């Protein structure tokens, strides 16, 4: 049987924590920042955790992670 392939885009977007949770970088922090409040920009700067119902789907994309 052949090896399972890793989805390269998912590999670049997601990272696993030591406890097994999946974290990602939030969107909307690249450009057009003047109209966004400092509170919103500060919250977007922190990494987010993937919700529990999406974890199974992401783990199928990353079989060796």
Swiss-Prot record:
Tagged with keyword Ligase: no
Any GO BP: translation
Disulfide bonds: none
Annotated GO MF terms: structural constituent of ribosome
Pfam family name, one: Ribosomal_L35p
InterPro entries noted in UniProt: Ribosomal_bL35, Ribosomal_bL35-like, Ribosomal_bL35_CS, Ribosomal_bL35_sf
Recorded family membership: Belongs to the bacterial ribosomal protein bL35 family.
HAMAP family xrefs: Ribosomal_bL35 (MF_00514)
Protein name as it appears in the record: Large ribosomal subunit protein bL35
Source species taxonomy: Bacteria, Pseudomonadati, Spirochaetota, Spirochaetia, Spirochaetales
Gene: rpmI
């Amino acid at each position: 049987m052949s090896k399972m392939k890793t989805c390269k885009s998912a590999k670049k977007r997601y990272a696993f924590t030591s406890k097994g949770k999946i974290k990602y970088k939030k969107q909307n922090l690249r450009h057009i920042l003047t109209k966004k409040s400092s509170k919103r920009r500060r919250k977007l700067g922190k990494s987010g955790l993937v919700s529990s119902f999406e974890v199974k789907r992401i783990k199928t994309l990353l079989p060796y992670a």
